[in-house]
Design a protein with these regions (language model features):
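Solvent-exposed loop/turn segments at secondary-structure junctions
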Residues: 40, 201-204, 254, 271
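Long, positively charged binding patches that form subdomain-scale interaction surfaces
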Residues: 168-243
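Conserved catalytic-core surface of thiol
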Residues: 249, 254, 258-326
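Extended, H/D-rich, highly charged conserved domains that either
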Residues: 82-186
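Papain-like cysteine protease catalytic cores
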Residues: 1-108, 112
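Residues that flank catalytic or metal-binding motifs in active/ligand-binding sites
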Residues: 29, 193, 242-244, 261, ...
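Structural recognition of the beta-strand scaffold that forms the well-ordered cores
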Residues: 29-31, 40-42, 195-198, 247, ...
């Protein structure tokens, strides 16, 4: 944000209203992993605040709002305010989550019962050695932005949407929804690994039984209202935006071997609902409410790979294509 940006401008009010989101984009996760690494969960277990982040986030947002107010009150003190707020943020996170280990002794037993020992290792070394082979950092994010002014096969990005200074920007390749489906199905069938995605999880959802389908409820008949917005209009008029990230873990194909019937989804809402936390999504619901998937770059045809080297069309911070980070 440029110095002198009015506190009541649309940009500042948007950033302040979402000063610290609890979600995020694939690129954001990769930025964190590349800078800080990862540790096995057994060595840095869950806390009450990691399982329920609400109160912790309230305090972090309050800290950031206070810091911004102090910057506006005394512009000459911006650097010192940033330093103090950064230290305070680290302190709050440590109180709620604990201090991540700077190094650890890595020992494990594999699926065949064989014991292994790798000695002392840092989180960054662990990420590079044991996760780097999956090449997750080379994945690209595909989106289905249905608005006609945003051409398919072109890159788009969101201004001010980032989480690590100097990290990779959050950018997407805009593609047809069917191409996203084809990529997801190919990964599930050929590699058998989960596929990260972002969707508008609220419409036509049976949370208790774990189902998404476009014809799940007949609200129009109940209320006598024709809810006739298509996907483009829902995005344009703020009726829909991606708001939750999950993972595709399975696909159900019809007997013809071609038609996709439904998708199996691993959610993060606990195992007391749905099928022990797993949901079923109809293929038509994917069409209407799935907006983003992360896939290996190698799956893209030559013209799409070439498009990744072109500059992105930047959209404003409040654009719905940036909503998943809320």
């Amino acid at each position: 944000v440029e110095a002198g940006e009015p506190a009541d401008s649309r940009l500042m009010q948007h950033l302040l209203s979402d000063v610290m989101g609890d979600g995020g984009q694939w690129t954001m996760a990769m930025n964190v992993y590349k800078k800080y690494g990862a540790v096995p969960k057994d060595l840095f277990p869950e806390t009450e605040s990691s399982k329920n982040t609400g109160e912790m986030n309230v305090q972090l947002r309050r800290l950031l709002h206070t810091a911004v107010a102090h910057m506006y009150a005394d512009p000459a003190s911006i650097e010192s305010v940033i330093a103090e707020a950064t230290a305070a943020g680290h302190r709050i996170l440590t109180i709620h989550l604990g201090e991540p280990p700077k190094s650890f002794d890595w020992e494990w037993t594999d699926k065949d019962g064989e014991f292994h020992r790798d000695g002392e290792i840092t989180p960054v070394e662990f990420w590079q050695k044991y996760v780097g082979s999956a090449d997750l950092e080379s994945y690209v994010c595909l989106v289905d932005d249905p608005r006609q002014e945003h051409a398919k096969g072109k890159k788009i990005g969101i201004e001010h949407l980032g989480n690590v200074a100097g990290g990779d920007p959050t950018e997407y390749l805009n593609v047809p929804n069917q191409f996203m489906k084809d990529c997801v199905r190919q990964i599930l069938e050929e590699q058998g690994i989960p596929v990260w995605f972002g969707a508008d999880c609220h419409p036509m959802m049976d949370r208790e039984n774990g189902a998404w389908a476009t014809d799940l409820f007949e609200y129009g008949k109940v209320y006598g209202v024709d809810f006739d917005l298509n996907k483009e209009d829902r995005v344009r008029f703020a009726d829909s935006a991606m708001n939750h990230a999950m993972a595709f873990v399975g696909v159900d194909v019809a007997e013809d071997g071609t038609t996709t019937r439904r998708w199996r989804v691993e959610n993060s809402w606990g195992d007391k609902i749905a099928d022990k936390g797993y949901f079923t999504m109809s293929d038509d619901w994917f069409t209407e409410y799935v907006y983003e998937v992360a896939v290996p770059k190698a799956l893209l045809p030559a013209e799409y790979q070439a498009a990744l080297d072109e500059p992105a069309t930047m959209l404003p911070a409040w654009d719905p294509m940036g909503a998943l980070a809320d």
